[in-house]
Amino acid sequence: MAPVKVVLLDIEGTVCPISFVKDVLFPYALEALPGTLKAKWDSPGFASYRAAFPAEHAGSQETLAAHVRDLMSKDLKISYLKSLQGYLWETGYRNGELKAPLFADVAPQLARWREHNGAKVMIYSSGSVPAQKLLFGHTNGEPSDILPWLSDFFDTVNAGPKQEKASYEKIAAKHQEYPIGEWLFLSDNVKEVEAAKQAGMQSYIVDRPGNAELSEEARKEHRVVKSFEEIGDL
């Protein structure tokens, strides 16, 4: 197996619990939505978020809010929704109401890979790049802000859907100094891991508390780790 030069990380269920997104971030966004729409509806800074929504849902605060609630109830990963969620979370992160609860092994292992192995660490999540940066800039660890440790960020807008091989090829093509076989993608999602492997990356399934149960087939087909510590040095 080729040495790993780039570690590409999923977020939800990989570096932090799925429950943080489902039980903390999503409810926070829904609670903040009406007041934000009322305060920012006509402000220039909000215009791009509003304009990204389909016209039939962007005509009034009520129709936009109803559409957001509908999309979130179905957990649909649509880019304009993800962008708005990041906007809503920004206040919570900045005022200290929101802090990302990274699993205890994450920050020490990222530091180890960077400092001892010389690897680059990058992020690929269905959450928007601005939302990713908010999360890693406001963690429960010490230091709280680990953005300086991360070299690049990818989402469904700048890379594509996470279950498609072409998305991983596109990500690797942006950093051609690292052959695709020297990338390691870590995710809790079996289909994402399969897509990354099809593209030529190394990839492991991360099995964290609260994640979906893995099938026996998935466990036989892929390497499964419960902690980044199990990966050790690259």
Swiss-Prot record:
Pathway: Amino-acid biosynthesis; L-methionine biosynthesis via salvage pathway; L-methionine from S-methyl-5-thio-alpha-D-ribose 1-phosphate: step 3/6; Amino-acid biosynthesis; L-methionine biosynthesis via salvage pathway; L-methionine from S-methyl-5-thio-alpha-D-ribose 1-phosphate: step 4/6. Pfam families: Hydrolase. Substrate binds at S125, S126, K162. It comes from the Eukaryota. Signal peptide: none annotated. It is found in: Cytoplasm; Nucleus. It catalyses: 5-methylsulfanyl-2,3-dioxopentyl phosphate + H2O = 1,2-dihydroxy-5-(methylsulfanyl)pent-1-en-3-one + phosphate. Binds 1 Mg(2+) ion per subunit. SUPFAM superfamilies: HAD-like. GO terms for biological process: L-methionine salvage from methylthioadenosine. Keywords: Amino-acid biosynthesis, Cytoplasm, Hydrolase, Magnesium, Metal-binding, Methionine biosynthesis, Nucleus. Its EC number is 3.1.3.77. GO terms for cellular component: cytoplasm; nucleus. It is an enzyme of class 3 (hydrolase). GO terms for molecular function: acireductone synthase activity; magnesium ion binding. Mg(2+) binds at D10, E12, D188. Its cofactor is Mg(2+). Belongs to the HAD-like hydrolase superfamily. MasA/MtnC family. Bifunctional enzyme that catalyzes the enolization of 2,3-diketo-5-methylthiopentyl-1-phosphate (DK-MTP-1-P) into the intermediate 2-hydroxy-3-keto-5-methylthiopentenyl-1-phosphate (HK-MTPenyl-1-P), which is then dephosphorylated to form the acireductone 1,2-dihydroxy-3-keto-5-methylthiopentene (DHK-MTPene). Monomer. This is Enolase-phosphatase E1.
